[in-house]
Every structure is written in structure tokens, then in C-alpha cells.
Amino acid sequence: MPLAAYGVTHQGRRSTNEDSWLVDLDLGLLVVADGMGGHNAGEVASALAVQVIRDVFAGSGDIPREALLIHAVQSANERILTAAAEQPAHSGMGTTVVAVVVVDDRAFYTSVGDSRVYLWRGGRLTQLTRDDSWLAETLDGAGEQPQDIGTHPMRHVLTKVVGLRPELDATVSECALAAGDALLLCSDGVHGAVPHELLASMLASQKAVEDVAQNVVRSAMNRGATDNVTAIVARVAR
């Protein structure tokens, strides 16, 4: 089904931008990666992840695209580990990855880290992915939660990233798409600064996806985002 998509990134209040993103409508592929690591290693890791994922899909031949997501992310994991071993200054680098591939009327998606995919449909915004973070696991847990959970020093710690260790457990989920649906892929610079309700109202706009994506990033900046800020907005034609 016809899909329009557009991505925007901004370094925010950081000296460098360690986010990378990809919109490839020929492949139906959308990716956001938020890198981490010293000596500019974060931007190396995120750029490698995006490039490897795209290369896997571009060279897939007749393999169904929905079957490639896990292989693509695991290939990115291996490439980042190799690059870190070859360059000591990049040791310990890693990145989040959230990737969506649209095939006919379905979206297949995977996420590692705390970058997210949201689905907007009929006035409602739903977070499709679950953060791989201490905070998310604590909130989902059955035990007693710390009273200071909102300010806890562990709240931003990720439990899974691409490039951290050789074994990477990634899963693929899917959802049906309908005319008028919108997808938002974003780094934590967006969802950490912009309230869910405001994201929903911006995605409800009938403006072009370029304008909506720019508005999302601008809103994060206006609300004091301290991290790099990246958003991809995709919309299924009515």
C-alpha cells in the first residue's frame, strides 16, 4: 500500500549527533539508531548499524523481507563488535536499533534498546515496542518498586544494545496497517521530552509527513531535550 515517510534529526544540546536514521521506501525500510560510546564511537556504531541493515535488505534477493529483520540486526551487532575490536578508541561502542519493514498491508518491527515505534490510528497513539531498560523492567516487575523510580540513577540504564556482546536476542512483531495509519520511529531524545498526548496530537495532523516529523523534533527541542533528537514519520495513504 502507498507509504510516505520522512526523517529528521538534530544534535540537540550535544556537541555531536550520535543518532542515525534511514528511510528507504523502495525497500519499505525505516530505521532509527541511537549510538553510545566515547571518542565519537556512538555515531560510528549507529551509522554502521543503519548501513548494515540496509545492505542486508538490499542484497536479500528473493528472501521475504519480513524474514530478514533479525538477521539484519544480528549482522549489525557482529559488524559493530568487529569494528570495536579493530579500533581500540571505539571499544565499548554500541547503539539502539528500531527497525520497521512494511510489506503490503503489514508492518514488521524489531527493537533493541530504548528507541521506539508508535502506531497512530483513529485518534489513538500506541507504543508498539518495549524499552530494553532498567526502568521498563522495574515497572513491569512484580516486586516492590523504588519510591524514587522517576529520579533513580538507574532509570536510563539499558539492558540490551546492539554491539554490547556477541549474543543478541532480538524478536520480530507485526501489526496490520490500514489507510490513514501513521508510524513514528524515534530516539529517546523525542519520547523523553515530548508527552505521549502531544505526540498523538501531532501525528493526528493531516500535514505532510515532512512537516509532522519536523514538528516532532522541534517540539522536543522546545521542551528542553538534552539528547540527540531523531524522528521518522510514515503514513499510509488514505
Residue ranges and their predicted role:
Residues M1-R238:
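PP2C/PPM-type serine/threonine phosphatase catalytic domain
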